[in-house]
UniProtKB/Swiss-Prot annotation:
Transit peptide: 1-34
Protein's recorded name: Large ribosomal subunit protein uL30m
Record key words, sorted: Mitochondrion, Ribonucleoprotein, Ribosomal protein, Transit peptide
Gene Ontology process terms (BP): translation
SUPFAM superfamilies cross-referenced by the UniProt entry: Ribosomal protein L30p/L7e
Molecular function, one GO term: structural constituent of ribosome
Amino acid sequence: MAGILRLVVQRPPGGLQTVTKGVESLIGTDWIRHKFTKSRIPDKVFQASPEDHEKYGGDPQNPHKLHIVTRIKSTRRRPYWEKDIIKMLGLEKSHTPQVHKNIPSVNSKLKVVKHLIRIQPLKLPQGLPTEENMSNMYLKSTGELVVQWHLKPVEQKTHES
């Protein structure tokens, strides 16, 4: 910058306009190489296909309502927006499952960090649990939510003779 100012001071007034025009072109951001560019992956890659449903065992007419999301890779040396999404989804601790709804807003966030996580459908073989069963449930590694039924003792009838 000092060299440009030295040129402005040493040149006659007619040359001043050409130097200032050159400075204006340097001030713009057109000459900066941006590191992150738009992804060149076509949209058809992200669309669901019948082969995917056969391969992964999904039903497009009856999709599952809940996801089990588990972070399986570290967020170190990842961009800040991926770290923010991991924090929003509650996946700071690795290999700890979190349950999320299968809705477009959540799915768009999951798509950004899909290389860091594992997504499984939540299977409910015994149906939706009730409030009383909430303490008697556990989650299998296969994605099944199992309710442990506690048997109540049978009351014995006393015979009066």
